[in-house]
Amino acid sequence: MSSIYQGQLTVSIFGQSHAPAIGVTVDGIPAGETVDLEELQAFLARRAPGTGAWATTRKEGDKPEFLSGLVQGKTCGAPLAAVIRNTNTRSGDYENLKDIPRPGHADYTAQVKYGGFQDVAGGGHFSGRLTAPLCIAGGVCKQLLARRGIFVGAHIAAIAGIPDASFDPVGLEQAALLAPGEKNLPVIDDEAGKRMQGAIAEAKAQLDSVGGVIECAVLGLPAGLGDPMLDGMENRIARLTFAIPAVKGVEFGAGFGVATLRGSQNNDPFYMDGDRVRTCTNHSGGILGGITNGMPLVFRAAVKPTPSIGQVQDSVSLSRKEDTKLEIKGRHDPCIVPRAVPCVEAAAAIAVYDALLEQEKRREQP
């Protein structure tokens, strides 16, 4: 399975949802960097299951155990390796899934690709549980970025079509960026959050689920970070964001909305702010030609409704080659959007930190 991100950083995610452990290795972090384990644990707690009425009742401590790369709280130059032990699993809920694939899940495609040898319990390696090690890597990168004056934050932009307020794409301040992450439900507008919770509760009562949108921003980036074409900042961030299993779309700046604008509306006019070049608007999301322009980097990720729902659904028996019905057992989130917010932050942090390391390496070359 291809679960490796390769750049100046090499990030490799391993494990399955109901395996003894899940984990990550991160190679390429310079020696001597401080990692605050309490801050990392708090970041992981935002993703952890069992918090909020919208979350699965499966509870996991999600406490990372570092096996390599960290000595007395500082990186030592060896690959950073950490595992999280899986302690609350009920694999019996998944026994029939090799024969009857769940709609909306990777059961069928995994069966075809891996010939029946894949681990189906809890979704195996395809599970959203694997975003926990992604958050270990991203949580470390967030800390390293913050020490450079670069901050990553996100909030729920919408759930079930109910919109939150948006980040200010031009004048976003650090306090406003980070404030949603301090809340149990990471929104800007608390009244919108209450309506979202109502929509989640309604879907849950109907044995259904809802999806939504997450908006993420990065502040403090210098102009000139990234590359054209295949290694642009959009490419890097999108690749890692799509590692989150529920993400089905990513857009930057005005995104698909630019298709309805004229050039005179979409262009972001430049102006001088002292010695600094800025733009009056930010439809580009802080990226032009794959390269940052110094404005806030803003993007959004579309998160699908949880595919595991309690309603009886149509499926097939692969062994009998006939249509059948499926009723999914187990513990599932009626909405995974709130728990996905730190995952999107993690993806952005890895991409940005990796790009910074690459830029620094280039500047060191004669």
Please annotate each region the language model reported.
Residues 1-366:
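Generic N-terminal targeting/processing segments that precede catalytic cores or assembly contacts
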